[in-house]
Design a protein with these regions (language model features):
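Conserved ATP-driven motor cores of ASCE-family P-loop NTPases powering translocation/secretion/packaging/pilus
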Residues: 385, 392-449
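Conserved acidic, metal-coordinating active-site core of Asp-based
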Residues: 86-180
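P-loop NTPase catalytic phosphate-binding loop
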Residues: 230-358, 368-387, 391-395, 399-403, ...
Length: 492
């Protein structure tokens, strides 16, 4: 299951005239029964929300005051995410005739046309506050506070990634909410600008639109929407015509093959850095200890001390964390048993939290060899993403070959490796019309794409080279990349 949480606005989205209709409430209950979770993200103050929405218990967290207050209904615990408004500011607004005015734990709210007076008061007092509009409402908050920052705090407490969340809204203040979530939806009554930014616009308005989205989630986990989510695709490089070659961040199985020194680890490192830059997490099964300094990942284990499954899982549960599992300290005979123990635990973590988003298996032929049944060892779940790295296709189990969505061969023997992949997989060999790839290039082919031909992939150089064994890098987080799209190549 890819989408583990639905994050919804209240007024104008979940609610009609301030109230949630029974059919909408019933859909929320069905979503919870599927194992998914709910977060309410609203500009309302909590006291007011509790008066109009008696079923806050359906939500694991409520992000109130437009991202400034976190509330957990199950414990009745409130956590302000920013300081309260200055008393002098509220007093001066009232003296200047601003009203009605409400003051929450953090937020100050009024209505148009008082925005000019509000801005003048902020300027006169020299305050670092921002003004956010919401269909006539004027909300004043500390700089940098919005629905996305509040939701990020809630998801972190839930041990979920925004990449496993769906957001839905209707108004100006929902832009940040929708931008944070992997998949964004706008109800039919939403503002045109929000509809233009959303991945999906529902046919129904208000709560009916939320019900529609829930039904799609329950039907196929929004798999039918996948072709529209190009904004999350990760750039691998370009072809000879300058077309960008991308991979999807979800549901891909890459097989990278080539001799030692052909550039397999450089390609893998570059891909992992791009995934990390977009806040996708990964777990590298590093047989020889080659990936210890991959950016924004923590190396666990060393040549003198193998890692434990518990420390791997503990690290990966953290928001934005990626792990390099160094198995060089294990005897070769113990590596497959280690993976047999780790694989179901990784699968359980993925089912619960969505992380790690990618599993990278180096030296796949050592762990998943061709001469042994390896189905129970495949670090695959339903639609999960895996990168396999090996020397030759005929060295790995056929389960890996059958699952491959993108085949990449490096080095002077790339076309021979493609022939071997097709022969072992029982596929017709595609026609290639270019010379063997040079250093920094690869042959790339999508075997399941109709009429797809192999292309020469010009690989973007990674920021860091092949790692020294046993080193650990710092851990960091960045925002979700949403780059402008260039021309798309045939492997997209």
């Amino acid at each position: 299951m890819r989408y583990l949480a639905l994050c919804t606005d209240y007024d104008g989205t979940l609610a009609t005239d301030g109230r949630v209709l029974p059919e909408t409430e019933s859909a929320l209950e069905r979503l919870l029964a599927s194992g998914r979770r709910l977060v309410l993200v609203t500009g309302r103050e909590l006291d007011d929300l509790q008066k109009v929405c008696p079923r806050l218990d359906l939500f694991e967290y409520v992000v109130a005051e437009n991202g400034a207050l976190l509330y957990q209904p199950s414990t009745d615990e409130e956590t302000p995410l920013a300081p309260p408004p200055p008393e002098a500011f509220v007093t001066l607004l009232r003296q200047r005739g601003v009203g009605p005015i409400s003051v929450g734990r953090v937020i100050v709210a009024t209505w148009e046309p008082h925005e000019s007076t509000v801005l003048a008061t902020i300027r006169d007092l020299g305050l670092e506050l921002q003004v956010i509009f919401n269909k006539g409402a004027v909300m004043i908050l500390p700089a940098g506070v919005n629905k996305a920052t509040g939701l990020a705090s809630a998801l972190e407490k839930m041990e979920l990634s925004p990449h496993n969340a769906v957001g839905i809204g209707d108004a100006e203040n929902d832009h940040a909410l929708l931008a944070l979530c992997e998949c964004s939806a706008a109800v039919a009554n939403a503002l045109p600008t929000l509809k233009g930014a959303a991945d999906l616009v529902t046919a129904g308005d208000h709560g009916a639109g939320v019900v529609e989205l829930i039904e799609e989630l329950l039907r196929d986990d929004l798999a039918s929407l996948e072709p529209r989510l190009e904004r999350h695709n990760v750039l691998l490089g370009t072809d000879d015509q300058g077309n960008e070659i991308h991979i999807r961040p979800h549901g891909e199985t890459l097989l990278v093959v080539g001799a030692d020194g052909a550039g397999k680890s450089e390609l893998a490192t570059g891909l992992m850095e791009k995934l990390a830059a977009a806040s996708y997490s990964f777990c590298v099964i590093d047989v020889e200890g080659d990936y210890g300094t991959v950016a924004k990942a923590v190396s666990l284990g060393s040549p003198s001390r193998p890692p434990t499954a518990n420390e791997i899982l503990k690290l990966l549960r953290g928001a934005g964390q990626s792990a390099v599992v160094n198995l060089s300290g294990l005897p070769a005979s113990d590596r497959r048993p280690f993976l047999m123990d780790l694989t179901p635990k990784l699968a359980e973590l993925r089912a619960r939290s969505g992380r790690p988003h990618w599993v990278v298996v180096d030296e796949t032929h050592d762990l998943l060899p061709a001469n042994e049944a390896s189905g129970e060892l495949l670090p695959l779940g339903d639609g999960e993403s895996v990168l396999h790295i090996t020397e030759r296709p005929n060295l790995v189990t056929r389960e890996v070959l059958r699952a491959t969505s993108l085949f990449i061969a490096l080095g002077a023997s790339a076309q021979t490796l493609l022939d071997e992949f097709c022969q072992v997989s029982g596929l017709e060999r595609p026609v290639t019309r270019f010379a063997p790839p040079k250093k920094g290039e690869a042959l790339a082919w999508r075997p399941a794409s109709p009429n797809a031909r192999p292309v020469r992939l010009n690989i973007a150089a990674p920021q860091h080279g092949r790692a020294a064994a046993g080193a650990a890098s710092g851990v960091g987080k960045t925002g979700i990349e949403r780059p402008a799209r260039a021309r798309t190549g045939p492997l997209h």
